[in-house]
Each structure stands twice: as C-alpha cells, then as structure tokens.
Amino acid sequence: MSVKIGRNDPCWCGSGKKYKACHQAFDERIAMIASQGHIVPTHDLIKNADQIAGIKESCKINIAVLDYIEKHIHEGMNTAEIDKIVYDMTTEMGGIPAPLNYEGYPYSVCTSVNDQVCHGFPSKDVILKSGDIINVDVSTILNGYFSDSSRMFCIGDVSPEKKRLVEVTKECVELGLKEVKPWGCFGDMGQAVHDHAFANGYTVVREIGGHGVGLEFHEEPWVGYNTKRGQEMLLVPGMIFTIEPMVNMGKVDIYVDSKNDWEVYTEDGLPSAQWEIMVLVTEDGHEVLCW
C-alpha cells in the first residue's frame, strides 16, 4: 500500500530535504505524463546522490580492469588468462567480479569471440588468433554497488568486414547515447541504434538488451533496440542503465548453447559485435559512468 507524502515530510529519495523542496514537482510532472499513457519509472529506479557516488567508485575498478586488458590482450593468449586478470585485479582493488556465481555462471568475465554474441565462457582451449574479434564484458561489485561495461578488441590482422562491424556497433552506441536526455524515452535511443545498424546492412539482436544497474546487477528497465521514438519508458534524472546493442553481421537469429545454457551464438555463424556503456541520466543530459 502506497503512503502519501506530505509537503513537509522528508523526501522519498533520502536527500534529507522536505518533499516540497525536492521531488514534489518532479512527481507531479511524472503523474501528468503517466496520465497521458506513457510508461514512467518507479521511485526505486531513481538513484540518489549517495548511491550514485558509490556506483561511480565501482565503475573506477571496472574501467581500470578493461584499460589493463586493452593494453595486454594479444594473439596467442587464451581467454582463461583474461578471466584470471579480471579476478585478480578486481579483488586486489577491493571489488568482487559480479558475474562469478551469478545464477550459476562459473567465471569472472564473459569473453565472446567472433560468432559468439554474448556470455562466452573463458577457456584455456580458446586461444586468440589473428583475425579474431572478441568482446570482453566486465562487471564489478564494490561495497554493494554494481558497474558493468564491455569493449571489443581486434586481434592481429582483422578483415575489413569484421573491423567495419566493430566500428559501426560502436557508432550505434554513440548515436544512442546522444538521444539520452531527461524527459525523453528509451525508444528514442533504441531507434537511433537500430536505424544505424540497419542502414549499414546489419541486424540488432532482439532477445537480449541493456538493463538498469547500480544497486543490483540487472534491474528494470529492460533496454531494447527494436523500438520506436517516443515509445518505451520515460528517461528521468537519476536513472542508470546500460546501452549494449549486439549487432550481427548477418541474420538476427541467435541460439543458446544447450551444453551450458549460457553461451549465445549467431544462427548463421557470422560474427557479432557488442560495446557496452553505463549511463546516468542527469538534469541536463547524461553522464557516461563506465565504458
């Protein structure tokens, strides 16, 4: 049962301010927009200043780990070595790898090579070869706060076709980011991502998308990219989520490896690419917290 907040009561956000001096006008605007049929966020999706500060500290570890991998990933390296780097660096800095034991996932990182769309298992048997593209997806818990981002890496002499896929996927993220602003919609961002991929002859995975993040590994809302401008949930200050489209060189169809129920592949065996950033909606735009 919801309890009505009085104008002079402490605001629900935890700022310590009176409701009338903090989020009352905000809530009234949200209620008006909801009355017009739009999907609006609940209060629990809006982070306060203390939570944002804690999340930013977690992001520092995540960025440092990916920066290190970017400098040291190389041909001949196996992906189990990447997993060890992620575990060792994260724990040395006081964090916990968020994927480790998450819903039974047995590793500290996801390493997805070529036609692997996401959730690739690190392995001593997966040795990086010249011509490979790989997504390294790192997620960190620090003092109960979560961060999540991924980058693509080209190993050795990569074909122009694969390089273009990697570059266009990054452009999709950048174009989607430009659409993130308060009182816009997730559909604005999703359509920008989808349209750029489609214009370049690619497809965007439908079944897997971005998500809210910060207090949990995966929070609402689910963030899709086959959406229309002006649709989906409203973007408001304090929301934190990932933009992480998975863009396929060929057909959109994917499948999950039945041997482990984790690793996702393209149905046609053609490469897939993904970049992931973590974004905060601010009062006047957005801030990228993790990349």
What annotation goes with each model-predicted range?
Residues 6-8, 15-291:
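Active-site neighborhoods and metal-handling regions in enzymes and metal-associated proteins
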Residues 1-3:
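Short, intrinsically disordered linker segments that flank or connect zinc-binding domains
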